[in-house]
């Protein structure tokens, strides 16, 4: 409580407020562009495939060429905010939210493990917000709800595995 709400200067408290600040632009842009970008571009396979390939190449280059200077606990507000802002690009079909945030973190010199940890923490508020926003559209779709729950559980295992893998 003291670390988070009272903003005591601990790494956990600081990172909590960084996550809050980094979530706002992605959420706002996503809310504003939801009907325009997703509906229009979502039906264009060439856009989706191109975005996926381009972002994959950019992530590969960023991971190989960027220095790994910054650890999780040393990330700055600027780094965390720009990583959060980059989430907005995920509204382009074919652009992975995790991929674009990992790319941004690596381009800013954050090491792999720290970028992955921050990316996964950052996913919680944005995914939860998007789920609540779209809740009315799928609340009575039982197969969809089962799929979401299964994806969540699987995702937790994958995140744990990936974080362990990135430590190596």
Show the residue positions of the predicted features.
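Multi-pass membrane proteins that catalyze or facilitate reactions on polyprenyl-/lipid-phosphate substrates
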Residues: 1-96, 100-168
């Amino acid at each position: 409580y003291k670390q988070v709400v009272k903003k005591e200067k601990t790494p956990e408290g600081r990172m909590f407020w960084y996550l809050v600040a980094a979530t706002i632009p992605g959420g706002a842009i996503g809310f504003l562009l939801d009907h325009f970008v997703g509906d229009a571009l979502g039906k264009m396979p060439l856009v989706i495939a191109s975005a996926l390939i381009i972002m994959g190449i950019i992530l590969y280059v960023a991971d190989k060429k960027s220095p790994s200077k910054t650890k999780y606990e040393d990330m700055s507000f600027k780094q965390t905010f720009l990583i959060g802002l980059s989430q907005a690009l995920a509204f382009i079909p074919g652009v992975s939210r995790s991929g674009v945030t990992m790319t941004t973190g690596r381009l800013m010199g954050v090491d792999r493990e720290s970028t992955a940890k921050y990316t996964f923490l950052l996913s919680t508020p944005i995914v939860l917000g998007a789920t609540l926003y779209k809740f009315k559209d799928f609340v009575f779709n039982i197969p969809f709800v089962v799929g979401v729950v299964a994806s969540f559980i699987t995702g937790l295992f994958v995140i744990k595995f990936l974080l362990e893998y990135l430590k190596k």
